[in-house]
Amino acid sequence: MSSLIMQVVIPKPAKIFHNNLFSVISKRHRFSTTITTRGGRWAHCSLQMGNEIQTGRRTGGYQPTLWDFSTIQLFDSEYKEEKHLMRAAGMIAQVNMLLQEEVDSIQRLELIDDLRRLGISCHFDREIVEILNSKYYTNNEIDESDLYSTALRFKLLRQYDFSVSQEVFDCFKNDKGTDFKPSLVDDTRGLLQLYEASFLSAQGEETLHLARDFATKFLHKRVLVDKDINLLSSIERALELPTHWRVQMPNARSFIDAYKRRPDMNPTVLELAKLDFNMVQAQFQQELKEASRWWNSTGLVHELPFVRDRIVECYYWTTGVVERREHGYERIMLTKINALVTTIDDVFDIYGTLEELQLFTTAIQRWDIESMKQLPPYMQICYLALFNFVNEMAYDTLRDKGFNSTPYLRKAWVDLVESYLIEAKWYYMGHKPSLEEYMKNSWISIGGIPILSHLFFRLTDSIEEEDAESMHKYHDIVRASCTILRLADDMGTSLDEVERGDVPKSVQCYMNEKNASEEEAREHVRSLIDQTWKMMNKEMMTSSFSKYFVQVSANLARMAQWIYQHESDGFGMQHSLVNKMLRGLLFDRYE
């Protein structure tokens, strides 16, 4: 790391205006104000207040938030108390003993798999890696003629970043190697694990592609005839969304429900899962309250009534992306990013005129307080909130990591706003882009780049210039994550957005270009998601970035598919199923 880094001066956050100061926005008024920075500097700006032009402005038709500030601040949980932490420590020790017991090899693998699904494997990561390495990677303790055990081992080894070849499945293929053996169709448990394992495939792994097709075909048939209720439930969940595409904590509650119904359930594991869930929920509530206080203090939702007030949903996203318990700072930071991306997106998609949007883009490109002078009042508060936030995050990174992230973070936000402007021009021109033209811009406009850029600098222990530059140029893992995020979002929100007058999304672009039906277009987008996941899987195995940042990048894609899995807008339109999942994770304790 360069010794010159510490000499670089980062512009510190300007003091945010008090909410009452912006109550004059709707009135004809002009005033000057002086803004104090953290370091004692003074930035002088003049705000021109005038009657807002309403003609031609769109409306998002978004519902009010279900979770107001006062309600959020009232949430509290007894599970943040020390006594629960001590009880959990005792249970963790007991489960650790279960892992170390000399039991059947398959039982140990099944326990590891259960711990992951229950959301408690983080307590045993070191032990799990040691077990997988000594028992299942360097030594072959599994009968490779057993499809169930082979597929389960393959899945877990890849999930824990071990390099394992798809060739382990060759013995299950027919003599010609063109498909899997027909004799496997009655092995429902084996087919389910084969199906799950196939989603960890990289580009060019044809055996795993065959495995996916074979397992999918026969699992759909088994659903109609199998009598095992617990197994049927697992199959239905997997066919809906495979484990590799699921986020951990938002799914933990439903898996606890499924686990406690199983005849082979371990009571200690179950009790730990329930206790741990409630303890994590208590932590999440404290983080949400802090993020909500920030959101309320910005005044954005009060002064810009056309934007989505979704701070709880913004926080919910972070629970699937940044999973480690110790990264509360990063979850709160990511919540703020989500809220700012949502606000600016609504400015561009709903309220701003093209002239105003061009002015806003220029101001972001220049990145200084003076640029605010050219903006209409409603944009000034938005600009200043973003300016303050980014500079504060850069300041914290320089303080904590010794690295000046300012130019990298600025570029992420500039690229986002420039992509928004391109889409705004398409809208005003009535332009219908091809799918290729749309994707070239929309993988940026989805907002994943600021998220991953900020997280890179917070989650990388030792930041190397080479990795920062690779991030700056948007490494393939960033592109893959953002592409899945975009496509999943389009599958859920495109109809609502087009009805509001937005530009065509990927589904509509394909329909226009190929004269295809909506279902044909959606099937094509699903295939693009699958192809991009294979790229993502390859990068997860080979990337030079830290393993945790790679995992977080994949989690961003996973969270998008979780939110939009029913192909409806679970964010902007407050879908009832998403609200149920949100309550289940953040507010309703597990009894």
Swiss-Prot record:
The keyword Plastid is assigned to this record: yes
SUPFAM superfamilies reported in the protein's UniProt record: Terpenoid cyclases/Protein prenyltransferases, Terpenoid synthases
Binding site for Mg(2+) 3: D489, T493, E497
Gene Ontology terms, MF aspect: 1,8-cineole synthase activity; magnesium ion binding; terpene synthase activity
UniProt-annotated binding residues for Mg(2+) 1: D345, D349
EC number of this enzyme: 4.2.3.108
Compartments where located: Plastid, Chloroplast
Main location: plastid
Reactions that this protein is recorded to catalyse: (2E)-geranyl diphosphate + H2O = 1,8-cineole + diphosphate
Keywords in alphabetical order: Chloroplast, Lyase, Magnesium, Metal-binding, Plastid, Transit peptide
Cofactor note: Binds 3 Mg(2+) ions per subunit.
Domain of life: Eukaryota
Transit peptide start-stop: 1-56
Gene3D superfamilies referenced in this protein's UniProt entry, alphabetically: Farnesyl Diphosphate Synthase, Terpene synthase, N-terminal domain
Cofactor needs: Mg(2+)
Entry-linked Pfam families: Terpene_synth, Terpene_synth_C
GO BP: diterpenoid biosynthetic process
Cellular compartments per GO CC: chloroplast
SS bond partners: none
Record bears the keyword Transit peptide: yes
Motif DDXXD motif per record, residues: 345-349
Free-text comment about domains: The Asp-Asp-Xaa-Xaa-Asp/Glu (DDXXD/E) motif is important for the catalytic activity, presumably through binding to Mg(2+).
Subunit note: Monomer.
Similarity comment text for this entry: Belongs to the terpene synthase family.
Function summary: Catalyzes the formation of 1,8-cineole from geranyl diphosphate. The enzyme also produces significant amounts of (+)- and (-)-alpha-pinene, (+)- and (-)-beta-pinene, myrcene and (+)-sabinene.
Protein name (record): 1,8-cineole synthase, chloroplastic
